[in-house]
Amino acid sequence: MATLNPSVEAVPAQTTSRQRWLYSIANLGNVIPYQAVGAILLFYYTDFKHLPVKWAAMAMTVYAIYNALNNPVMGYFSDRTRSHWGRRIPWLLFLTLPCMVAFAFIWMAPFDGIKDPGKLLAYFYIVLFIWEGLATMTSTAYYSLLPEMFMDYKERTDVSVRMNVVQTVGLLIGAALPAVLSTALGYPVMGIIFAAIACAAMYIGIPGMFERKGYQDEPAIPLGKALKETLINRSFVTVVIAQTLRFFATGILTTGMMFYMKYSIGADPSWTTISLAAAFIAAGLALWPWRHFIANKCEARTTTMIAYAVTGVSSITLALAHGTVQAILAACFVGVGLAGLILMGDVIMADVVDEDDVRTGQRRAGMFFGMSGLIITLSSALVAQVFGWLMPRFGYDSALAVQPATVDAGFRLFMSVPSVIGCGLAIAVLAFYPLYGKRLKEIKQKLAERQNQ
């Protein structure tokens, strides 16, 4: 039986609707670049630029490790920042523009993998590493503001719905449109357009952001101790493992969709836009029902477990689909499950930050979101390794002009089985998550008492 949510009757909202919308709009600045990289980077460098598949898989793994390691470092620096503008906002003000310039260069590779594979690989590493370092800092600063600006459960789920309505737009742009725009305009122009939209969204949203007084005055915890305190936190460890499995499942979906539509469904790759758009629109439409009928009646833990179950079951339909109509319907089914995961991801992590605040007296959102980014990012390495291990066994070779018929089954398997396994493991892990029922209610009460002192 679902546990009734003890957090829905909390303190009145402390932010305005305008502030919540502005904060949410800025989410486009994170979503568009990351979704574009997740959805089409591998396709661009293998199928279009002809980087050998094994090289690409290894490069993505190295990139994922780098991305993982820089997350806690950036989070720690964000927590320690002291400035007139606060701890988080300066990073958004000054790094957003160079971040988007670096993103645009990802899609301007001047080398071909058949003639100059070494140079193409070097270019891949340089531009991707520069972009990723800047993007990690800005995204960590952005998400660290969420538990500080929005203090109670209803306010957080409200802003989460808004963020994810915006995120649906970002998913449509960043993950669904590349197949069309890259064909019509070319990859370089596509990258410039995406960078401009993301940059504008972040700067539009910054005026609605604020930091609460007092948190910047807290004494900083040394890096070693901060890492230790984070990694021994049971609530954090269980959530971040589940989140990693979530991003593994969704990474499979976005990475494989263009291959799946081309080689399994037999459709033009541009149908990827329609199938992903269908999934994201379904997710956007499902956000309100998820919040109203499930999240407001169940705790974050229960809601998240239900969302994993729906996502895992729906992934099976991708393996069974034949023809574009069935593939699109299957994608819509997956989108309904994703809506629950999208809604609760930042909300459940905010509860972890609250618990740590009560326990240590420190507001360490940067470290938690940074460490979360470190571990979650490893999911992309796992996706790349599964792709690199599985698809050559079904005959996929990026150097071939025509792929063998066996790749059909390979991509059906790639799109379904890993996601089912990931979602099942996530549910098992969340069974050990301690912030529910009486414990969660105690944390909320203690935090409210501290704020009222």
Question: Model segments located where?
Answer:
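Membrane-embedded alpha-helical bundles of multi-pass transporters/translocases
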Residues: A2-Q453
